[in-house]
Amino acid sequence: MCGRFTLFSEFDDIIEQFNIDQFLPEGEYHPSYNVAPSQNILTIINDGSNNRLGKLRWGLIPPWAKDEKIGYKMINARAETLSEKPSFRKPLVSKRCIIPADSFYEWKRLDPKTKIPMRIKLKSSNLFAFAGLYEKWNTPEGNPLYTCTIITTKPNELMEDIHDRMPVILTDENEKEWLNPKNTDPDYLQSLLQPYDADDMEAYQVSSLVNSPKNNSPELIESH
């Protein structure tokens, strides 16, 4: 799964790397060393002509949901079953997004009682993007609430020693294909959702301070 990540890169670097044409005011971007579910996170969609950077709440709420509690259970979506699940079938075809990040955290189980937090990043330290889906849900008051989920897949050789799932990190080319609204074939779209090349990634243990979303400082990414 993917339940925590970082995004502390410079705002201008995000705009440049992902070819953003329309974006929220820079003052609304808050670098984070501990992005957690239920927070409003930076996301990118394509409207058919432009890449747009905005915010969606992490934890997808389907349009048919009775209340927003289901969102806490839907922070991730399995790549292998997207086209089978009622919550993800339609957004797979028409509501895709990418989520910029510079690393993510996963907890490695050492024994039944012990788990240690690991930080996983690209060896290059470059920005990357998770594949995601988004949805619109209307609150009981009739206000629209836009939410998203991060897609996971089977682990690569690096991740399989840490966890049995990993977030889908898209290659540059697959980012474009994933965002392109003209792509509507579920089989093709799911073929883009592959484990990232382990040779280009690295992982190391970090402080247990990351366990709490309340903690958010540069020391969270320091090797422990």
UniProtKB/Swiss-Prot annotation:
The keyword Nucleus does not apply. The modification Thiazolidine linkage to a ring-opened DNA abasic site is found at C2. The record marks E106 as: Required for sensing abasic sites. Formation and reversal of DNA-protein cross-link depends on DNA context. Catalyzes formation of the thiazolidine linkage in presence of abasic sites in single-stranded DNA. Mediates the reversal of the thiazolidine cross-link in presence of double stranded DNA. Coiled coil: none annotated. GO terms for molecular function: lyase activity; peptidase activity; single-stranded DNA binding. The keyword Lyase applies. The record marks H163 as: Required to stabilize abasic sites. GO terms for biological process: protein-DNA covalent cross-linking repair; proteolysis; SOS response. SUPFAM superfamilies: BB1717-like (SSF143081). The active site is at C2 (nucleophile), E106. PANTHER family: ABASIC SITE PROCESSING PROTEIN HMCES (PTHR13604:SF0), DC12-RELATED (PTHR13604). Belongs to the SOS response-associated peptidase family. The N-terminal catalytic Cys-2 residue forms a thiazolidine linkage to a ring-opened DNA abasic site. Glu-106 catalyzes reversal of the thiazolidine linkage; self-reversal is favoured by duplex DNA formation. Glu-106 is also involved in sensing abasic sites in single-stranded DNA (ssDNA). His-163 stabilizes the abasic sites by forming a hydrogen bond with the O4' hydroxyl group. Sensor of abasic sites in single-stranded DNA (ssDNA) required to preserve genome integrity by promoting error-free repair of abasic sites. Recognizes and binds abasic sites in ssDNA at replication forks and chemically modifies the lesion by forming a covalent cross-link with DNA: forms a stable thiazolidine linkage between a ring-opened abasic site and the alpha-amino and sulfhydryl substituents of its N-terminal catalytic cysteine residue. This is Abasic site processing protein YoqW. It comes from Bacillus subtilis (strain 168).
